[in-house]
Amino acid sequence: MQEIEIFCDGSSLGNPGPGGYAAILRYKDKEKIISGGEKFTTNNRMELRALNEALKILKRPCHITLYSDSQYVCQAINVWLIGWQKKNFAKVKNVDLWKEFLEVSKGHSIVAIWIKGHNGHAQNERCDSLAKLEAQKWVKTTT
């Protein structure tokens, strides 16, 4: 299986409010950037949207190392998700996106690594800037 790195970040202005997401996918010396946003959302939803949209791009099963400054996303992938499924996602927020994650992550092996946000990690900083730009686009449509 191919080794892929995914860096992702989500932003929400107001939380909830206008939001944006960005992800960088790296394979060897190739890089792909994706981004987008929504009119009314949360930072956690945008973080998860970034990951899901990145996974949709992959055409074959991969070993994925995910880097995120979201403890929510990293803990969910590495620890909580199995328990959530056993309890049929009772009291879990963003169930729609977690169920989508389960679908788009099928066949992949994913290890999520938490990185401290706003701490000079180049790819995280890039994703953060792109996600904020996407969120700003939606501010103009809500005023």
From Swiss-Prot:
What keywords were assigned to this record? Answer: Cytoplasm, Endonuclease, Hydrolase, Magnesium, Metal-binding, Nuclease
Compartment(s): Cytoplasm
Binding of Mg(2+) 1, residues: 9, 47, 69
GO MF terms here are: magnesium ion binding; nucleic acid binding; RNA-DNA hybrid ribonuclease activity
Which InterPro entries does its entry note? RNase_H (IPR050092), RNaseH-like_sf (IPR012337), RNaseH_domain (IPR002156), RNaseH_sf (IPR036397), RNaseHI (IPR022892)
Entry GO CC: cytoplasm
Cofactor(s), by name: Mg(2+)
Q: Quick one: which residues bind Mg(2+) 2?
A: 9, 128
Record's family? Belongs to the RNase H family.
The function of this protein is: Endonuclease that specifically degrades the RNA of RNA-DNA hybrids.
Q: What is this protein called?
A: Ribonuclease H
Natural source organism: Helicobacter acinonychis (strain Sheeba)
